[in-house]
Amino acid sequence: MRITALGTGMPNQTRAAVSISFLVELGNGDKFLFDMGSGSMANLFSIRPDFSRLDKVFASHLHIDHVGDFMGLHIGGWLSGRYTPIHIYGPTGSTPELGTKSFVEGMSKAWAWDLATRSGALPDKGAQIVVHEFDYKQLNEVVYQKNG
């Protein structure tokens, strides 16, 4: 297992400390991204991971320093060889509009033009986002389980 800190800073980032993100790579080739704060995707793209295997993202919560680069990851990963849907695992909100599903719907609307202009040039499945919400009020909830 290899863990790479792509960012460890706060929302008021600097060149040396962008917002939080961790890439976890397993020996079987699986890759997981935990948070994707603003600025962290530049560090991810600089190490040139195999984007075809980077399709699982876990958002601890929806502050900008934890999800600010989600759409950059989504669209950039699609452009870099991830031709399958991206899966985001994130919290519900105290109301539906404060949860991960609503966040993704809002971001998808905001970036609709960008996504539409790339459609047809790349496999459409890569443009899809699958949302998996977990109940933020639950303790010790399993949010992902595969291969054990």
Question: What is the meaning of each model-derived region?
Answer:
Residues 1-148:
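Binuclear metal-dependent hydrolase catalytic cores
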